[in-house]
Amino acid sequence: PQSIEHYLEVLDAFIEREITPLENQDDNIRFFDHRREHARTDWDRDGLPSEEWETLLTEMRRRADTAGHFRYALPEAYGGQNGTNLAMARIREHLAEKGLGLHNDLQNENSIVGNLMTPMVLHDFGTPEQQSRWMEPMLTGALGWCFGLTESAHGSDATWMETRAERAIHNGVSGWRITGEKMWTTGLHKASHVLVFARHSGHQGSASGIGCFVVPTDAAGFEVG
């Protein structure tokens, strides 16, 4: 559709005006040229992303959000533009075609038009109270979120998982007790909450009986190995 092609022109103008100058400022280009892996990595913290790299990404997202692009896929009620799947596919293709840069980096899913998987999950399946409490802080970065799906014995096949959720009462409060382990939980080092996928019913190999649980990283029993 022509409306999508026009929006690509709007994005290109924004990149030229706001993002490219930031990319070239203070040798930030080191995060995208042949030095990028070393520049992005804090080797003294077991290979976590460097603070300088994450600070730059935060500023990119702030500028994109201020300009109205970062939340494109979300409904207008959350500052988005009701972006369709078709539009998102075309935008990602266009930005990737421009090459590696601060505007778009498929290596770590950062882009001026956010691939907002976690907010979309909360919007589509969360309760109104959850949306009111977490959606905006999640989008601004005030709260860090990630998700736990992959397990060492089963990969990302979510129909086979050993993580279990059972109803329980703790200190008089009804909830869930989750037991299991996850791996490759990108972003956990700064996350306040994790979306943990666990089986609460059904049998291994079944697509039903799997739930997604919001788990605070300071919850009792939560450990990072």
Regions found by a protein language model. Give the residues of each.
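Amphipathic, small/basic residue-rich leader segments at the start of a protein or domain
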Residues: P1-I112, E129-R133, P137
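Short, solvent-exposed loop/turn elements at beta->coil junctions and helix N-caps
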Residues: A77, T150-H154, M183-W184
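N-terminal glycine-rich flavin-associated loop
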Residues: L106-E129, G155
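Short beta-alpha junctions and helix-cap segments that line functional grooves
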Residues: W134, M161, M183, V224-G225
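A short, Trp-centered hydrophobic/proline-enriched beta-strand micro-motif
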Residues: G141-L149
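Active-site-adjacent elements of ketosynthase-type condensing enzymes
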Residues: A153-E162
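A structural signal for short hydrophobic beta-strand segments in well-ordered beta-sheet cores
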Residues: T163-R167
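A short core secondary-structure module
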Residues: S174-G175, T179-V224
